[in-house]
């Protein structure tokens, strides 16, 4: 089996893992209720972009 000739440094290891970081969710303030919610999602009262999508 192959064995690494040199030990991988912390910097090299961390540079390789930069893509594994967490990202913040896309939150936006709802214009009607003023609450934060996920972008491109229907609000709890069934409206999206000012239109009623789901009748309650």
UniProtKB/Swiss-Prot annotation:
Comp. bias intervals (Basic residues): 7-20
Compositional bias per record (Basic and acidic residues), positions renumbered to this chain: 29-38
GO cellular component terms, semicolon-separated: cytosolic large ribosomal subunit
Domain of life where this protein originates: Bacteria
Keyword Metal-binding appears in the UniProt entry: no
GO molecular function: structural constituent of ribosome
Keyword set includes Cytoplasm: no
UniProt GO BP: translation
SUPFAM superfamilies, alphabetized: Zn-binding ribosomal proteins (SSF57829)
Segments of this protein annotated with the region Disordered: 1-56
Keywords, ordered alphabetically: Ribonucleoprotein, Ribosomal protein
Family: Belongs to the bacterial ribosomal protein bL32 family.
Protein name according to UniProt: Large ribosomal subunit protein bL32A
Organism: Listeria monocytogenes serovar 1/2a (strain ATCC BAA-679 / EGD-e)
Gene designation: rpmF1
């Amino acid at each position: 089996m192959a064995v690494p000739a040199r030990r991988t440094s912390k910097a090299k290891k961390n540079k390789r893992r930069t893509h594994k970081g967490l990202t913040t969710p896309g939150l936006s303030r709802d214009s009607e209720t003023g609450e934060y919610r996920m972008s491109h999602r229907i609000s709890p009262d069934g409206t999206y972009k000012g239109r009623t999508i789901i009748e309650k």
